[in-house]
């Protein structure tokens, strides 16, 4: 018999999945081409990968019933960045595209918040 925490985890996963599907529909309305949904590789996971006008967008979606903003940690950002590099290494046709990392918050109480260029790859300066 499943435990209560298993139901809770299932509810959170379902809510997250629904949030991702809503963002995909939103992106398609804005004429983005969805490349991957829930992309997984040995280095991590990316919720949505899309492109439009030679720009590749890696998207993290946070969904909540009531919270307006759910923080994304530096560790999560780093994991998404590594996964994005992995994706590009195996999909060379996107190598010349500009890259952007977006964050979408979706809450039933406050609606949709989009943060384009939510973070960037740290630039290394050699002296």
Swiss-Prot record:
It holds the Pfam family UPF0102. One of its GO terms (molecular function) is nucleic acid binding. InterPro entries: Restrct_endonuc-II-like, tRNA_endonuc-like_dom_sf, UPF0102_YraN-like. Disulfide bonds: none annotated. It comes from the Bacteria. Belongs to the UPF0102 family. PANTHER family: UPF0102 PROTEIN YRAN. This is UPF0102 protein ERGA_CDS_00540. It comes from Ehrlichia ruminantium (strain Gardel).
């Amino acid at each position: 018999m499943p435990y209560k925490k298993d139901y809770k985890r299932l509810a959170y996963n379902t809510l997250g999945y629904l949030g991702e599907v809503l963002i995909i529909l939103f992106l398609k309305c804005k004429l983005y081409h969805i490349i991957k949904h829930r992309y997984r590789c040995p280095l991590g996971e990316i919720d949505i990968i899309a492109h439009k006008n030679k720009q590749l967008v890696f998207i993290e979606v946070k969904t909540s019933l009531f919270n307006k903003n759910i923080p994304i940690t530096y560790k999560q950002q780093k994991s998404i960045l590594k996964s994005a590099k992995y994706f590009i290494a195996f999909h060379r046709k996107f190598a010349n595209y500009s890259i952007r990392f977006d964050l979408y918050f979706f809450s039933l109480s406050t609606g949709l918040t989009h943060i384009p260029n939510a973070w960037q790859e740290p630039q290394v300066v050699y002296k």
